[in-house]
Amino acid sequence: MPYVDRQNRICGFLDIEENENSGKFLRRYFILDTREDSFVWYMDNPQNLPSGSSRVGAIKLTYISKVSDATKLRPKAEFCFVMNAGMRKYFLQANDQQDLVEWVNVLNKAIKITVPKQSDSQPASDSLSRQGDCGKKQVSYRTDIVGGVPIITPTQKEEVNECGESLDRNNLKRSQSHLPYFAPKPPSDSAVIKAGYCVKQGAVMKNWKRRYFQLDENTIGYFKSELEKEPLRVIPLKEVHKVQECKQSDIMMRDNLFEIVTTSRTFYVQADSPEEMHSWIKAVSGAIVAQRGPGRSSSSMRQARRLSNPCIQRSIPAGLQNPNSLSVLPGPQPPPHIPQPLAATLWSQAVPWRSEEFTNLLPRSSQGTSRSRLSLQESQLPK
């Protein structure tokens, strides 16, 4: 999806047919700059390229007459649109239908409000500048602010950019991965939830490199490319505390930056668009919840069972659980070791206990007690 960067330019990834009528679309990073009256594209986001990397191509907005849908002109190319620029038509391919509509709208709006300027030999100068840069050495640098003073130090050894060979190698990689966001990976034990390219900050040199990320049910790992089988690192989801949009993106001067906070380290990852950033945050957070959710629910169910079935209820006899059963308890039975006829005779001759015959044995008030003693003495006197 196209998005607006910090310099108020519209940026995003598209696939372009650089060689006319070749039918081969290569993935490039496009920048629409209305202030510079240009629509340029690079091999990748310039923030991720070595210092001094030149652009791959450029078109003046004044040269573009119309931008329209080209699905009928190129039926085999999905989500394709065309730019009419002078004597040539540039065919580009978006990620989806919404991406196509947004790019067509922003480009048509840009060419309408552009004021024509005097033409210059921009394409020729671009080709000359690219030829002049072929033999130069490209070095990536790291900028640190120490005491308010910027200090620039090289991050790696100088590499000679052998123009034709290096570009062909990059083009070969891009053509092999037509849509790197959805490039398939070899099947693994866990189902892949989300996969795609992002830019990650290194742990030691703090440099930014493009890596292929893959999220499954238990881990999130990153590879050097989508063709690699072994990941560079695997982060277990149980070690991830939170995933959120980075609050230091202004300090790092990075768009679409989010962070993965773990026990030992915070990983800073840059997506290609705001939509892709939010998609990654949502996917990783959902995987964490899905992994930790069943544990909480099972423990809560066990606790609920313990509260609903206390141990004291299990020791109560079944007959006493019903209060109505107390009124129908069986009467006294003879001992089992006595024969039945003899037991019946003994029980028939036994004096039955009646509660009213023992009421005189209960303690009474002092007056009642003294009166009963006098009555007893009076009864013993001779008459």
Swiss-Prot record:
PROSITE patterns: PH_DOMAIN. GO terms for molecular function: lipid binding; PDZ domain binding; phosphatidylinositol-3,4-bisphosphate binding. Its main location: cytoplasm. Keywords: Cell membrane, Cytoplasm, Lipid-binding, Membrane, Nucleus, Phosphoprotein, Repeat. CDD domains: PH1_TAPP1_2, PH2_TAPP1_2. One of its GO terms (cellular component) is nucleoplasm. It is a peripheral membrane protein. SMART domains: PH. Signal peptide: none annotated. It is found in: Cytoplasm; Cell membrane; Nucleus. One of its GO terms (biological process) is multicellular organism growth. InterPro entries: PH-like_dom_sf, PH_domain, PI-Interact_SigTrans_Reg. Residues 370-383 have a biased composition (Low complexity). Residues 362-383 are annotated as: Disordered. Residues 7-112, 191-289 form the PH domain. Binds to membranes enriched in PtdIns3,4P2 via the C-terminal PH domain. Binds specifically to phosphatidylinositol 3,4-diphosphate (PtdIns3,4P2), but not to other phosphoinositides. May recruit other proteins to the plasma membrane. Interacts with MPDZ and PTPN13. This is Pleckstrin homology domain-containing family A member 1. It comes from Mus musculus. The gene is Plekha1.
